[in-house]
Amino acid sequence: MNIKMISSVDHLIIAVRDLNQAINDYEKVLGISPCWKGKHTELGTKNALFNFENTYLELLSPCDAGPGTEFINSLLAEKGDHLAGIVLGTQNIEHVQEDLNRNGHAFEISSGEAINEKDGKIRRWKNIFLPNTLSRELFIFIIQHTEGNLPQHESQDSSKVKK
């Protein structure tokens, strides 16, 4: 049986210094508000997510001490606010890990969690982070969402798009 390892471009990550200003700017461009604002407590980062029909955009900012803050701060110091990563989606991260390991790589699966500031709901996922040697210096990881969903936005309001 041939199982598809990667099923989607799950989301794009934009590293930002000032999350509130970035939210304001992207609301004007996209015509929608973020469906989720939260914090990765174990990483020391906070984010805002703009959900679309088949993917979402994550604005990611440092906030507390942690490995995520160190990583985002290094990206921001080098390039300023910018497209920082691509996240590939899978339905079976263990299969992806087995396949990658079978091809001579040793990858561990890590877990993540975030809490929505708006309603306290929790989302959980599993990740495999790809090294720069495989991703050609682009921050890429593979994700399988395991618990919770992003709220869908009602509809895009073209009156919010500012010229």
Predicted segments with their positions:
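Vicinal oxygen chelate
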Residues: 8-17, 48, 53, 58, 71-162, ...
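Core segments of cupin and vicinal oxygen chelate
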Residues: 6, 13-63, 102-103, 109-124
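Basic/polar N-terminal segments that are highly enriched at the extreme N-terminus
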Residues: 1-5
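A low-complexity, Ser/Thr/Gly/Pro-enriched, surface-exposed linker/loop concept
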Residues: 64-69
